């Protein structure tokens, strides 16, 4: 059932995936549903809704990623990082979260599904000092873009960028970007079976 729905959704948004990747994505939903009952990893309880609100909501970002090394800040159970890592085995993803139960879940997912391009790290973002900086800093966890840029400013390379996943856009929020940051792109994301607005903002730091 989920496999057939995933096929339809991928076709609808123009994304391609191998049979192995599709199996990993469906199995990830299964693990998230199973662990969620004990560890409360997400407020979404229904696997079909997980496929839409977590898997597809993450995957539609994929065509807009530039570079090979990314960090997903405040990733929770691995969103959007794990679906993006499955679809992009040539890219490296660091998944950062401050809660141990979420990191344990992510590591179990990596082990059971054989995902080799993820590193899960338990840390608060302000305390995390990577040895190598990132092409892209991703997050759907922050309440505002200002918060994201404030807490994550030290993570991208000089030519790297921030990818903020947002719902409805607020003109006030856009007008209050910290000095030295510029929104270069606003992408309207279409998620199958989801009526709510979804946007991806690409932000760069200017000298």
Swiss-Prot record:
Pfam families: GidB
GO CC list: cytosol
Protein localization: Cytoplasm
Catalytic activity, reaction form: guanosine(527) in 16S rRNA + S-adenosyl-L-methionine = N(7)-methylguanosine(527) in 16S rRNA + S-adenosyl-L-homocysteine
An example molecular function term from Gene Ontology annotations: rRNA (guanine-N7-)-methyltransferase activity
Record Gene3D superfamilies: Vaccinia Virus protein VP39
EC number of the protein: 2.1.1.170
Enzyme class: transferase
Positions contributing to S-adenosyl-L-methionine binding: 74, 79, 125-126, 140
Keyword list, A-Z: Cytoplasm, Methyltransferase, rRNA processing, S-adenosyl-L-methionine, Transferase
UniProt KW rRNA processing keyword: yes
Major subcellular location class: cytoplasm
Matching HAMAP family: 16SrRNA_methyltr_G
Family per record: Belongs to the methyltransferase superfamily. RNA methyltransferase RsmG family.
Biological function: Specifically methylates the N7 position of guanine in position 527 of 16S rRNA.
Protein's name according to its UniProt entry: Ribosomal RNA small subunit methyltransferase G
Lineage, broadest ranks: Bacteria, Pseudomonadati, Pseudomonadota, Gammaproteobacteria, Alteromonadales
């Amino acid at each position: 059932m989920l496999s057939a729905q995933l096929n339809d959704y991928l076709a609808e948004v123009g994304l391609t995936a191998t049979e192995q990747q599709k199996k990993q994505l469906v199995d990830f939903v299964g693990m998230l549903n199973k662990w969620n009952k004990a560890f409360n990893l997400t407020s979404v309880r229904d696997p079909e809704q997980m496929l839409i609100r977590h898997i597809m909501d993450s995957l539609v970002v994929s065509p807009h990623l530039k570079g090979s090394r990314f960090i997903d800040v405040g990733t929770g159970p691995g969103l959007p990082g794990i679906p993006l890592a499955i679809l992009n085995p040539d890219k490296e993803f660091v998944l950062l979260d401050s809660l141990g139960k979420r990191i344990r879940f992510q590591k179990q997912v990596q082990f059971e599904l054989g995902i080799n391009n993820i590193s899960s790290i338990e840390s608060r973002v302000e305390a995390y000092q990577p040895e190598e900086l990132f092409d892209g800093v991703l997050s759907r966890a922050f309440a505002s873009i200002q918060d994201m840029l404030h807490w994550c400013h030290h993570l991208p390379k000089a030519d790297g960028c921030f990818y903020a996943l947002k719902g409805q856009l607020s003109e006030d929020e856009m007008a209050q970007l910290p000095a030295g940051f510029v929104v270069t792109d606003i992408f309207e994301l279409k998620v199958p079976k989801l009526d709510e607005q979804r946007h991806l903002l690409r932000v760069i730091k200017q000298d």
